[in-house]
C-alpha cells in the first residue's frame, strides 16, 4: 500500500507487516468501471481470482465484495421484508449511487442503532441465501459460512444475474460483521426477527 499511495505511506509510517494480524479488503463490483467491467469475461475472471487469493484475513487478507457498491447498505426499508429491489441492471449500476441517494432511512451509517444493524444483518443473510440458494430465509451460523461464502455469492451472481445483465443488490458490510464476531453475535442478531 505504501508503494502506491503517499497518504497511506505517511499513515503507516513506523508499522511493519507483523503489526497487523488481520487484513480485510472491501471492493465494489463496479459494473461501469472500465478496468474490470462486469460484462467483460476477463474482468469478472480477475474478481474470481482475487476472491481465491484473498480468502483468509490472517494471510494475504479477506476480500468482501459489495454488489454493486458499498451504497447497497442504504438500499433498505424496514417495512420491506422480501426486498423490493432485488437487483439492478448492469447499465443502472453505474448510476446506483444516485439511485440510492433518495433513500432516507439508512443514509448515515454513523447514526445506525443496534436495531438498525440487527435488521441489516438479518436482511443480508436472507439476501445472500436468496442469491446463492434461491430462498429468502435465514440460515444457521454454520451454513452462513459453509454455503454463503464470498466465493459462493460471487459465483451465483455470475451465473444467475450477471449472465442476464443484472446484479443482485447486497452489502458485504453486515456479512463481515457476522463473520468477524463470534456465533453469539449471530444468535443475538436473529433472536428478534425484525422482518
Residue ranges and their predicted role:
Residues 1-6:
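Domain-level signal for Mg2+-assisted phosphodiester chemistry and nucleotide/NA-binding surfaces
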Residues 7-195:
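C-terminal accessory helical subdomains adjacent to catalytic cores in phosphodiester-
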Amino acid at each position: 500500500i505504501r508503494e502506491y499511495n503517499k497518504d497511506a505511506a505517511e499513515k503507516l509510517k513506523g508499522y511493519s507487516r507483523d503489526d497487523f494480524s488481520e487484513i480485510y479488503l472491501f471492493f465494489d463490483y463496479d459494473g461501469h468501471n472500465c478496468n474490470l467491467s462486469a460484462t467483460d469475461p476477463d474482468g469478472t475472471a480477475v474478481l474470481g481470482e482475487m476472491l481465491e487469493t484473498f480468502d483468509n484475513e490472517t494471510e494475504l487478507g479477506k476480500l468482501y465484495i459489495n454488489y454493486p457498491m458499498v451504497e447497497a447498505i442504504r438500499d433498505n426499508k424496514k417495512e420491506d421484508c422480501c426486498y423490493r429491489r432485488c437487483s439492478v441492471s448492469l447499465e443502472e449500476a453505474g448510476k446506483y449511487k444516485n439511485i440510492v441517494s433518495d433513500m432516507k432511512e439508512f443514509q448515515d451509517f454513523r447514526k445506525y442503532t443496534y436495531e438498525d444493524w440487527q435488521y441489516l444483518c438479518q436482511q443480508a443473510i436472507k439476501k445472500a441465501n436468496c442469491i446463492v440458494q434461491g430462498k429468502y430465509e435465514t440460515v444457521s451460523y454454520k451454513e452462513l459460512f459453509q454455503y454463503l461464502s464470498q466465493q459462493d455469492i460471487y459465483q451465483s451472481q455470475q451465473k444467475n444475474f450477471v449472465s442476464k445483465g443484472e446484479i443482485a443488490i447486497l452489502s458485504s458490510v453486515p456479512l463481515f460483521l457476522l463473520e468477524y464476531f463470534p456465533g453469539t453475535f449471530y444468535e443475538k442478531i436473529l433472536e428478534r426477527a425484525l422482518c
